[in-house]
Amino acid sequence: GDVFDNRSCIGLNTINRVIELFEHFSAIFKDIRITVGNHDIYKKSSNDITSLNMLKYIPNVKIYYEPIVEVIDGKTCLFNPWIESAEKEKELLAGVNVDYVFGHLEIGGSQMSNRSGVKIEFAGGVKSSDFKDAQVYAGHIHIKQDNRNIHYIGNPYHKDRGDRGNPKGVTILDLSTGKTKFIENEVSPRYMKEN
């Protein structure tokens, strides 16, 4: 989720470059899955109108507007886009038993930022225990972090000073083994603190 950052205005050059990028990805990867994020939607209360609609016509790209459970390589996976209400999220999670959750999630106890060296904790309604035994790979929070079964993959590059000291890159998950590989982004600019 959050392929785009601005929910109300995206420049034409940006639109064209993103379409070209996903067409390129589509030629390389047979299966590209995107969960709708809160910055991809027009209305805060609905995933119906989204900037991601422009990508749904590209081969091999699948966009999740609503939560869906699928079996992939023998593993039960929940694809969970942005849900505006913690109560709806809890209700959904109570009704599923899955191996993996992939989504745009706001989970209590997760660190929101490294800004100014102060750790900000989100005290939301959904907790790591609500996911039972599932391994959770989540977006929404920009910094990479692991807390038991919760894995925020973070942004692939630094966006602001709050990313200082946090590794950026891409996480690759092998569903058959459950093992991950992190490839650090050593190309993009980084925010650093100078003493």
List PLM regions with ranges.
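Divalent metal-coordination and catalytic microenvironments
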Residues: 2, 18, 37, 77, ...
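Catalytic phosphate/metal-binding cores of nucleic-acid and nucleotide-processing enzymes, i.e., regions
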Residues: 8, 16-28, 32-34, 90, ...
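Short, well-ordered alpha-helix to beta-strand connector turns
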Residues: 29, 74, 96-98, 132-134, ...
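Hydrophobic/aromatic beta-strand patches that form the interior of the parallel beta-sheet core
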Residues: 33, 64, 78, 100, ...
